[in-house]
């Protein structure tokens, strides 16, 4: 009989309900805020990798003039300039060049108005007939590819753990 009175008293007591509701909503809001922070950090770091890749391509263009093409074989300061530019963002040395980067080749615009690689720099084609544009001349492009190992701040709690990692980006720059 005593137990049933205690259970009935607990059912009618409302003093702790507000604290329980607050704890539930605070935890939901906290998880939401952790997601916002993690996603914002990911977007910022991805943006920095994109900027670093573009900076590397611009450094290649700035370092190697048209008289020293192809740049990968005739421009002695190319790798140093590109590496320095790629690591000039707030991410620093954590942004690295991918294996085989920088690479250079001849590109033409195909029928879909997209750049298409037609050959290495070792053998320059006479025109772009290989992609269906015989009236166009191929351009010398350098490709810079970078990578950054992203790690979420709150693994297992936020959706940022499902994002692509590492973050990789590629930039093309016409040299000649």
Give the role of each language-model region.
Residues 5, 26, 65, 99, ...:
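Solvent-exposed, flexible loop/coil residues
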Residues 12, 138-140, 167:
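Residue-level preference for short coil/turn positions at secondary-structure junctions
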Residues 38, 133-135, 160:
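Residues embedded in well-ordered secondary-structure elements
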Residues 2-86:
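Alpha-helical assembly-interface signal, strongest on the long, hydrophobic N-terminal helix that forms
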Residues 46, 50, 54, 90-93, ...:
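A general secondary-structure boundary signal
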Residues 145-176:
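Low-complexity, S/T/G/P-rich flexible repeat/linker segments used as non-globular hinges
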Residues 57-145:
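Short amphipathic secondary-structure patches
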């Amino acid at each position: 009989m005593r137990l049933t009175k205690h259970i009935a008293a607990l059912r009618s007591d409302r003093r702790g309900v507000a604290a329980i509701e607050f704890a539930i909503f605070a935890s939901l809001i906290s998880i939401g805020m952790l997601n916002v922070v993690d996603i914002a950090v990911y977007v910022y770091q991805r943006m920095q990798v994109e900027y670093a890749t573009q900076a590397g391509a611009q450094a290649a263009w700035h370092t190697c003039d048209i008289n020293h093409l192809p740049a990968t074989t005739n421009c002695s300061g190319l790798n140093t300039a590109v590496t320095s530019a790629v690591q000039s963002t707030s991410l620093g040395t954590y942004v690295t060049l991918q294996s085989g980067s920088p690479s250079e080749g001849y590109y033409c615009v195909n029928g879909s108005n997209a750049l298409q690689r037609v050959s290495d720099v070792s053998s320059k084609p006479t025109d772009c007939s290989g992609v269906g544009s015989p009236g166009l001349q191929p351009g010398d492009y350098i490709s810079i590819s970078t990578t950054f190992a992203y790690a979420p701040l709150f693994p297992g709690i936020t959706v940022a753990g499902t994002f692509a990692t590492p973050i990789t980006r590629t930039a093309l720059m016409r040299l000649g």
